[in-house]
Swiss-Prot record:
The gene is rpoB. The lineage of its organism: Bacteria, Pseudomonadati, Pseudomonadota, Gammaproteobacteria, Enterobacterales. Disulfide bonds: none annotated. One of its GO terms (molecular function) is DNA binding. Keywords: DNA-directed RNA polymerase, Nucleotidyltransferase, Transcription, Transferase. InterPro entries: DNA-dir_RNA_pol_bsu_ext_1_sf, DNA-dir_RNA_pol_bsu_external_1, DNA-dir_RNA_pol_su2, DNA-dir_RNAP_su2_dom, DNA-dir_RNAP_su2_hyb_sf, RNA_pol_bsu_bac, RNA_pol_bsu_CS, RNA_pol_bsu_protrusion. It is an enzyme of class 2 (transferase). The RNAP catalytic core consists of 2 alpha, 1 beta, 1 beta' and 1 omega subunit. When a sigma factor is associated with the core the holoenzyme is formed, which can initiate transcription. Pfam families: RNA_pol_Rpb2_1, RNA_pol_Rpb2_2, RNA_pol_Rpb2_3, RNA_pol_Rpb2_45, RNA_pol_Rpb2_6, RNA_pol_Rpb2_7. Its EC number is 2.7.7.6. NCBIfam families: PRK00405.1 (NF001616), rpoB (TIGR02013). CDD domains: RNA_pol_B_RPB2. DNA-dependent RNA polymerase catalyzes the transcription of DNA into RNA using the four ribonucleoside triphosphates as substrates. This is DNA-directed RNA polymerase subunit beta.
C-alpha cells in the first residue's frame, strides 16, 4: 500500500486477515443522494420536484376553456450561507421559481384552438437546502431528517395465526396497500365466507366488489370454479370424468366403465386407481341420480318454451329440480367442482350471503358503507367507486407497488399502471382462495423485501405535492371565476400553502429531529438512522415483538446490535456499513460473485428478495491464494437459514466481516467477544461521549476511525493536492499542484476553520490544523482536526491505564476509582458552550430597554457591563450575575404620600420600570466568549451593536484582503515565471513594482497571449474582491428580520470548563459503564515495579456476569501497544541510529500471522521514520477489525515484543502501605469515554423556592429549582424509627404548612430556632376532596 505524506505520520497496525475487496462507501450518501434526487431536474419526471409538478399540472378550469401548464423550475441562490443562518437563527433555503404557462382556448372554435398564451416565472416559496454534511438548518438549528422504514406498497397475504376466533381457526386475509389511496382488504370469516373492507371500514361480502365491476353471478362462478358436466342419456346420468379430481375421495358407488370395475363402493380412491383410469382414457362414468343431489349449478337454466327460470346459478340441485330440467329438454347440466381438500366452495357460499343482485345495488351498498347517513344517488355511487381505486388522482400504487404486486401474483412484467384493474382484483382473490385451499404461502411482513426505506427526498417530495394539491383547488376556482384576459399566472398561485406544507415537514414532522451533535459519531449515526415510527409508520404502543425482532434479512442491511434500549427497541435501527438502497427503496448489501468455485472480486448488490435464491458464504471462509474454498463443506446462508453446503453449490460470498454491523458497532474492538446486550450499550454509549479538550486516538481501534472522522464532516479535508503555503489557528492555505488546477485560475485553496462554536448539545466545536508549512498534501488528506478527532482519526475518549481489582469498596457496583493525575493532566476536561438570549420586546406600556441603568442594583453587579448594558467579552461570570441589563415599563401604580413627595422634590421616575435583566442561571459559571446583537430594521443600533458591526467589517475586510494577497501572490509568481521565460532578466523585474509587470510586452506571441490572460485575471480578481466586500458589508449592516414585536435580541455565549469529578458517568466501549466514586491522590493509587501508578481501578466482578470479555482483550492489547511505544520512546531518548529504530518498528508492523497490511519502512526517508516514531512513542495504535481481529497468540507475541509478561498480569503494590498485593493483577490500557451525563447538570440544592399551586408543596426537578420529595415510603421509614419530631418537621414546615414555613423562615433570620407546626395544606386539599363527594368534615377546636 502506498501512503501519502500525511498518512505516513502515524500508521495504525492492522491485524485484519481478510483482504479489503470493497472500500467503505461514503457514509452519508443515503441522505445526500436522496436529497439530490429531490432537487435536481429529472428529464424523465420520475422523481423529485419535477415529478410533483408533473403530477399536479396542467390544471384545467372546470369549463375546460383554459389551463395552467408547468414548463420548468429553477432554484435560486440562498441569501445567507450556513454559518450566517445559524448565527441569525434563520432557515438555510433557496427560493423556488417556477415557469408557468397560462393557455386560453377559444370558446366557440373547435377543440384545442388557442386564443392566448401567457408565460411567467412565479415564486413558489423557499425550499430548505441540505448542507454538505447531510443536515438542514431550520430556524438556526441543525436538524436531520431520519429515513423511515415503512411497509412497501403492493399486495400482502397474511393470516391471523388463529388468534381472532375462539376456535383457533386460522383466518387468511389479503391487503392491497397503495402508495397513496384507499386500502383494500379481503378476509375470510370463521364460516369461510370471503369479505372485503375498504379503508378498514365495515366488511361487506367480497362478491359486492365483483358485482360493482359489472360481473353477474354466472360470470363470478365461472371465474373461480372448475365445472363438472353431467349428461342425461336414456334416463341415466353420466358424468364427464377428470380422474385427478377423485383423489382422496371415498367411492359412494362402484366406479366402472365398459364392464371394468375400477373402484369398488366404499373404497378410498388412491393414486393407483387414478393412474389406471387415465391409462384407459375413461372419459365418462355412469353415476346414480342421488349423486347429483346437493351439487351447485353453475349457470341459470330457463325453460325455453315458457321462458320460466327453472333454477338460478349457485342454487343446489334436488331430485325434483333435476326431473324438471330433464322434462324441459336440458340434457347437459354444469355444476361447480368443490371438495373439502383443495377446492373449497368459498365464493359460492359468499354469493349466498351477498344481499346485492346487480351492479347498482352493489354500488349503493359500497356508498352506504363509505358515507353512512348520506342518501345515495346512482351518479354519486358510481363516482365514489370509480374514485376509490380507478382514478389516477386519488389512487397510486407507484412503481414499487406495481412491481411488488406483479411479483406477488407471479406475473412476468414488473411495470404497469398505478391504478387497479378488474384483473388485479380477481387475481388477488384467486391467490387468497388458493392459500385457503393450501396452495401457496402467506407473506412475512417483517421480511426486508416487504419493507422499504423512505428517505428525505421522497418525504419532502410528498409534502411538496400536498402543498401543490392545496394550491390546485384555488387555481381551479380562479380559472373559472376570474377575468382571464387580465390574469397572469402570478395572480393565481399563492405560495403560502406550499411553503407552509414544506415548513411544517422540516420544522415539526416526527422524523425531522434535532441533530444529536455530541460528537462526530453521534452525527453520522443520526443521519444513518432508520425509524419504523412516524407518519405512515408504526406506533410504539401497537408494535409487537415480531416487528422489533432481528430478522434473517437484516443481515448486511440493518445492524442487529445498535438500537435504543427502552420503548423504542427494535423500532429504530441503524444502517449497516455497506448497505444502500436500490431504485425501489429496498435495502441491498454487496456480495462477491462465486464462479465455478472461485471467489471473484466482481461485486453484486442484492436486495433481500434476490438474496433468498442464492447460497451465500460468510466473509471469514478460508480461501487459498487463487480464491478457491479450502474446505469441502462451507458454512453458508440460504433462504434465511445457516447450514453446511459443498463448495460447488456456493453462489456468493460476503464482502467483509464488518458487513453485518453499523458504523457505531464497527468501532468496538473485539466485538465478537462481547455479549450482544452489552455490545448494544457500548454502541449506544459511544454516541454520548463528550469531546475532550485534548483528543487522544484509541490505542486499540478497529480501522474504521479514519472513515468516520472524514465522512462526518467535522474535519477539514483537502479538496485538491498541493503544498501548505500558510497555516494559522483559523486558516489554512494550499498552493494547488499544477496538474490539478483548472485552466486560468490562481491555483490557491483557502480553508477557513471553525473556532469555538456551540453544538446542539452545548459541546464545543473547534478545528485545529494538523499540517505544517511546506508539507506536501494529497487530495483527501485531513488538514485540520475537529472535535473528537486526532490526526484525522475518531478519538472519543482517552487511553487510561486501568487495573482490574477491588479497592476499599470504592468500586462496588460499577463505581470507578480515578487517580488525581487524570484531573491534573486535564485528560477528561471538556468545554461546554451555552447560549443565553435576552429579548427586548415592544409592550403595551412601551418598549423594553437594554441599558446599564437598572433600578435598585449596586455598582458591583454592573461592573462587568459596558455602557450599553451588555457584558464584556472575556468576563468571568457566576450564577446570578447580570449579563444583559434590561428594564421593562410597568403600569402606573397608586403612589404613597411619601413617594409623591420624593417625586415632587427629586423628579424621580425610576420606579416606572422593573428589572428584567438576563442573569446567569444558578449553578453555572464560565467565561463570556462571544456576544451577538440583533437589531430590528428601523430601530436605532446601540453603541455595542455598532462596535460589533465595525469589528465584523474589519475582520471580513482582513479575511478578504488576505485572500486577495494570497491569490495575487500566486498570480504574480506565474507572471514572473512567464516574463523570465520570455527573456526579461529577473533583477530588472525585481526593481519594477509588480503592477507595472502587466504593461510589459513579450516578443513571443504565445507568451504575450498568456500574459494578457493573466492580466485579465488580475483585474477580475480585484473586481471580485470589491464585489465580495460590498456584499459582506451589506449583509453586516442591514437590519435583522426578527419576530413580530421583538426590537432587539442579545445573545451571550458562555464557555464552561468542566473537569472530571465524582458523580460523572464514564464508560468503556463494551457496555461497561460506571460512576466515579472518588478521585484518589496519586500516591495512594496502586503502582507497579517501575513505580508507575494506575489511572483507574475497575471492579473485576463487572466482567464475568456481563460476559463482555472484549474489554479484557482490549486491556491486554492496549498494554502491548503502550509497551512498544515506550520502547520506541526509550530509543528516541537514547538517540539511537535510525536504522535500529526502523528495524524495531518494522518488526512490530510485521508481527502476526497472515495479516493483510504490508508496511515497508525501507521506502520511508529517515525523517519520515523519525516523525513516525515521534507519533508512536505514546503507544503504537492498533486496528483489530470486527470479527476479523487479533488472535490470542498475536496479543501474546505483541506483549513479548514490548517486553511485557505474556499473561498480561503484573505485580502491583499498595500506594498507601507499599505492600505487595497478594496476587498478580490485570493491568493495561483501556479506552475510556466521559459521557454527557455530568453531575453538574444533574445536581442542585434548594433552600426556598417556588411551590405547587394546589398542594403548596415544593416543585420537583432542577429546571423548576425544586426540592427532594420525601415520599410515602420515606414516611414509613421515619414512622418505623419512631422519629416523631423529624417526621412532624418533614410533613409540615419543610413541605406544605404555609404559615408554619413563613414563621420558621422569620425565626431563622432572627436567630431563634423554634418551630411551630400548623396545618399542612395537603390536608385541606383532602378535606375539600371528601366534601366534593358529599361528606362534610369539619375540624373542631377542643
Amino acid at each position: 500500500m502506498v501512503y501519502s505524506y500525511t498518512e505516513k505520520k502515524r500508521i495504525r497496525k492492522d491485524f485484519g486477515k481478510r483482504p479489503q475487496v470493497l472500500d467503505i462507501p461514503y457514509l452519508l450518501s443515503i441522505q445526500l443522494d436522496s436529497f439530490q434526487k429531490f432537487i435536481e431536474q429529472d428529464p424523465e419526471g420520475q422523481y423529485g420536484l419535477e415529478a410533483a409538478f408533473r403530477s399536479v399540472f396542467p390544471i384545467q378550469s372546470y369549463s375546460g376553456n383554459s389551463e395552467l401548464q408547468y414548463v420548468s423550475y429553477r432554484l435560486g441562490e440562498p441569501v445567507f450561507d450556513v454559518k450566517e443562518c445559524q448565527i441569525r437563527g434563520v432557515t438555510f433555503s433557496a427560493p423556488l421559481r417556477v415557469k408557468l404557462r397560462l393557455v386560453i382556448y377559444e370558446r366557440e372554435a373547435p377543440e384545442g384552438t388557442v386564443k392566448d398564451i401567457k408565460e411567467q416565472e412565479v415564486y413558489m416559496g423557499e425550499i430548505p437546502l441540505m448542507t454538505d454534511n447531510g443536515t438542514f438548518v431550520i430556524n438556526g438549528t441543525e436538524r436531520v431528517i431520519v429515513s423511515q422504514l415503512h411497509r412497501s406498497p403492493g399486495v400482502f397475504f397474511d393470516s391471523d395465526k388463529g388468534k381472532t376466533h375462539s376456535s383457533g381457526k386460522v383466518l387468511y386475509n389479503a391487503r392491497i396497500i397503495p402508495y397513496r389511496g384507499s386500502w383494500l382488504d379481503f378476509e375470510f370469516d370463521p364460516k369461510d365466507n370471503l369479505f372485503v373492507r375498504i379503508d378498514r371500514r365495515r366488511k361487506l361480502p367480497a362478491t359486492i366488489i365483483l358485482r360493482a365491476l359489472s360481473y353477474t353471478t354466472e360470470q363470478i362462478l365461472d371465474l373461480f370454479f372448475e365445472k363438472v358436466i353431467y349428461q342425461i342419456r336414456d334416463n341415466k346420468l353420466q358424468m364427464e370424468l377428470v380422474p385427478e379430481r377423485l383423489r382422496g375421495e371415498t367411492a359412494s358407488f362402484d366406479i366402472e366403465s365398459n364392464g371394468t370395475v375400477y373402484v369398488e363402493k366404499g373404497r378410498r380412491i388412491t393414486a393407483r386407481h387414478i393412474r389406471q383410469l387415465e391409462k384407459d382414457a375413461v372419459a365418462h362414468i355412469e353415476v346414480p341420480v342421488e349423486y347429483i343431489a346437493g351439487k351447485v349449478v353453475a349457470k341459470d337454466y330457463i325453460d325455453e318454451s315458457t321462458g320460466e327460470l327453472l333454477i338460478a346459478a349457485n342454487m343446489e340441485l334436488s331430485l325434483d329440480l333435476l326431473a324438471k330440467l330433464s322434462q324441459s329438454g336440458h340434457k347437459r347440466i354444469e355444476t361447480l367442482f368443490t371438495n373439502d381438500l383443495d377446492h373449497g366452495p368459498y365464493i359460492s357460499e359468499t354469493v349466498r350471503v351477498d344481499p346485492t343482485s346487480d351492479r347498482l345495488s352493489a354500488l349503493v351498498e359500497i356508498y352506504r358503507m363509505m358515507r353512512p347517513g348520506e342518501p345515495p344517488t346512482r351518479e354519486a355511487a358510481e363516482n365514489l367507486f370509480e374514485n376509490l381505486f380507478f382514478s389516477e388522482d386519488r389512487y397510486d400504487l407507484s412503481a414499487v407497488g406495481r412491481m411488488k404486486f406483479n411479483r406477488s401474483l407471479l406475473r412476468d412484467e414488473i411495470e404497469g399502471s398505478g391504478i387497479l384493474s378488474k384483473d388485479d382484483i380477481i387475481q388477488v382473490m384467486k391467490k387468497l382462495i388458493g392459500i385457503r385451499n393450501g396452495i401457496g404461502e402467506v407473506d412475512d411482513i417483517d421480511h426486508l423485501g416487504n419493507r422499504r426505506i423512505r428517505s428525505v427526498g421522497e418525504m419532502a417530495e410528498n409534502q411538496f405535492r400536498v402543498g401543490l394539491v392545496r394550491v390546485e383547488r384555488a387555481v381551479k376556482e380562479r380559472l373559472s371565476l376570474g377575468d382571464l384576459d387580465t390574469l397572469m399566472p402570478q395572480d393565481m398561485i399563492n405560495a403560502k400553502p406550499i411553503s407552509a406544507a414544506v415548513k411544517e415537514f422540516f420544522g415539526s414532522s416526527q422524523l425531522s429531529q434535532f441533530m444529536d451533535q455530541n460528537n462526530p459519531l453521534s452525527e453520522i449515526t443520526h443521519k444513518r438512522r432508520i425509524s419504523a415510527l412516524g407518519p405512515g409508520g408504526l406506533t410504539r404502543e401497537r408494535a409487537g415483538f415480531e416487528v422489533r425482532d432481528v430478522h434473517p434479512t437484516h443481515y448486511g442491511r440493518v445492524c442487529p446490535i445498535e438500537t435504543p434500549e427502552g420503548p423504542n427497541i427494535g423500532l429504530i435501527n441503524s444502517l449497516s456499513v455497506y448497505a444502500q438502497t436500490n431504485e425501489y427503496g429496498f435495502l441491498e448489501t454487496p456480495y462477491r460473485r462465486v464462479r465455478d468455485g472461485v471467489v471473484t472480486d466482481e461485486i453484486h448488490y442484492l436486495s433481500a428478495i434476490e438474496e433468498g435464491n442464492y447460497v451465500i458464504a460468510q466473509a471469514n471462509t478460508n480461501l487459498d491464494d487463487e480464491g478457491h474454498f479450502v474446505d469441502d463443506l462451507v458454512t453458508c446462508r440460504s433462504k434465511g437459514e445457516s447450514s453446511l453446503f459443498s463448495r460447488d453449490q456456493v453462489d456468493y460470498m460476503d464482502v467483509s466481516t464488518q458487513q453485518v454491523v453499523s458504523v457505531g458497532a464497527s468501532l468496538i474492538p473485539f466485538l465478537e467477544h462481547d455479549d450482544a446486550n452489552r455490545a448494544l450499550m457500548g454502541a449506544n454509549m459511544q454516541r454520548q461521549a463528550v469531546p475532550t479538550l485534548r483528543a487522544d486516538k484509541p490505542l486499540v481501534g478497529t480501522g474504521m476511525e479514519r472513515a468516520v472522522a472524514v465522512d462526518s464532516g467535522v474535519t477539514a479535508v483537502a479538496k485538491r493536492g498541493g503544498t501548505v503555503q500558510y497555516v494559522d489557528a483559523s486558516r489554512i492555505v494550499i498552493k494547488v499542484n499544477e496538474d490539478e488546477m483548472y485552466p486560468g485560475e490562481a491555483g490557491i485553496d483557502i480553508y477557513n476553520l471553525t473556532k469555538y462554536t456551540r453544538s446542539n448539545q452545548n459541546t464545543c466545536i473547534n478545528q485545529m490544523p494538523c499540517v505544517n508549512l511546506g508539507e506536501p498534501i494529497e487530495r483527501g488528506d485531513v488538514l485540520a482536526d475537529g472535535p473528537s478527532t486526532d490526526l484525522g482519526e475518531l478519538a472519543l475518549g482517552q487511553n487510561m491505564r486501568v487495573a482490574f481489582m477491588p479497592w476499599n469498596g470504592y468500586n462496588f457496583e460499577d463505581s470507578i476509582l480515578v487517580s488525581e493525575r487524570v484531573v491534573q493532566e486535564d485528560r477528561f476536561t471538556t468545554i461546554h458552550i451555552q447560549e443565553l438570549a435576552c429579548v427586548s420586546r415592544d409592550t403595551k406600556l412601551g418598549p423594553e430597554e437594554i441599558t446599564a441603568d437598572i433600578p435598585n442594583v449596586g455598582e458591583a453587579a454592573l461592573s462587568k457591563l459596558d455602557e450599553s448594558g451588555i457584558v464584556y467579552i472575556g468576563a468571568e461570570v457566576t450564577g446570578g450575575d447580570i449579563l444583559v441589563g434590561k428594564v421593562t415599563p410597568k403600569g402606573e401604580t397608586q403612589l404613597t404620600p411619601e413617594e409623591k413627595l420624593l417625586r415632587a422634590i427629586f423628579g424621580e421616575k425610576a420606579s416606572d420600570v422593573k428589572d428584567s435583566s438576563l442573569r446567569v442561571p444558578n449553578g453555572v459559571s464560565g467565561t463570556v466568549i462571544d456576544v451577538q446583537v440583533f437589531t430590528r430594521d428601523g430601530v436605532e443600533k446601540d453603541k455595542r451593536a455598532l462596535e460589533i458591526e465595525e469589528m465584523q467589517l474589519k475582520q471580513a475586510k482582513k479575511d478578504l484582503s488576505e485572500e486577495l494577497q494570497i491569490l495575487e501572490a500566486g498570480l504574480f509568481s506565474r507572471i514572473n515565471y512567464l516574463l523570465v521565460a520570455g527573456g526579461i532578466e529577473a533583477e530588472k523585474l525585481d526593481k519594477l513594482p509588480r503592477e507595472r509587470w502587466l504593461e510589459l510586452g513579450l516578443s513571443d506571441e504565445d507568451k504575450q497571449n498568456q500574459l494578457e490572460q493573466l492580466a485579465e485575471q488580475y483585474d477580475e480578481l480585484k473586481h471580485e474582491f470589491e464585489k465580495k466586500l460590498d456584499a459582506k458589508r451589506r449583509k453586516i449592516t442591514q437590519g435583522d428580520d426578527l419576530a413580530p414585536g421583538v426590537l432587539k435580541i442579545v445573545k451571550v455565549y458562555l464557555a464552561v470548563k468542566r473537569q472530571i469529578q465524582p458523580g460523572d458517568k464514564m464508560a468503556g466501549r463494551h457496555g461497561n459503564k460506571g460512576v466515579i466514586s472518588k478521585i484518589n491522590p496519586i500516591e495512594d493509587m496502586p503502582y507497579d515495579e517501575n513505580g508507575t501508578p494506575v489511572d483507574i481501578v475497575l471492579n473485576p466482578l463487572g466482567v464475568p456476569s456481563r460476559m463482555n470479555i472484549g474489554q479484557i482483550l482490549e486491556t491486554h492489547l492496549g498494554m502491548a501497544a503502550k509497551g512498544i511505544g515506550e520502547k520506541i520512546n526509550a530509543m528516541l531518548k537514547k538517540q539511537e541510529e535510525v536504522s535500529k529504530l526502523r528495524e524495531f518498528i518494522q518488526r512490530a508492523y510485521d508481527l502476526g500471522t497472515d495479516v493483510r497490511q504490508k508496511v515497508d519502512l525501507n521506502t520511508f526517508t529517515d525523517d519520515e521514520v523519525l516523525r513516525l516514531a515521534e507519533n508512536l512513542k505514546k503507544g503504537m495504535p492498533i486496528a483489530t477489525p470486527v470479527f476479523d481481529g487479533a488472535k490470542e497468540s498475536e496479543i501474546k507475541e505483541l506483549l513479548q515484543l514490548g517486553g511485557l509478561p505474556s499473561s498480561g498480569q503484573i505485580t502491583l503494590f499498595d500506594g498507601r502501605t507499599g505492600e505487595q498485593f497478594e496476587r498478580q493483577v490485570t493491568v493495561g490500557y483501556m479506552y475510556m469515554l466521559k459521557l454527557n451525563h455530568l453531575v453538574d447538570d444533574k445536581m442542585h440544592a434548594r433552600s426556598t423556592g417556588s411551590y405547587s399551586l394546589v398542594t403548596q408543596q415544593p416543585l420537583g426537578g432542577k429546571a423548576q429549582f425544586g426540592g427532594q420529595r420525601f415520599g410515602e415510603m420515606e414516611v414509613w421509614a421515619l414512622e418505623a424509627y419512631g422519629a416523631a419530631y423529624t417526621l412532624q418537621e418533614m410533613l409540615t414546615v419543610k413541605s406544605d404548612d404555609v404559615n408554619g414555613r413563613t414563621k420558621m423562615y422569620k425565626n431563622i433570620v432572627d436567630g431563634n430556632h423554634q418551630m411551630e407546626p400548623g396545618m399542612p395544606e395537603s390536608f385541606n386539599v383532602l378535606l375539600k376532596e371528601i366534601r366534593s363527594l358529599g361528606i362534610n368534615i369539619e375540624l373542631e377546636d377542643e
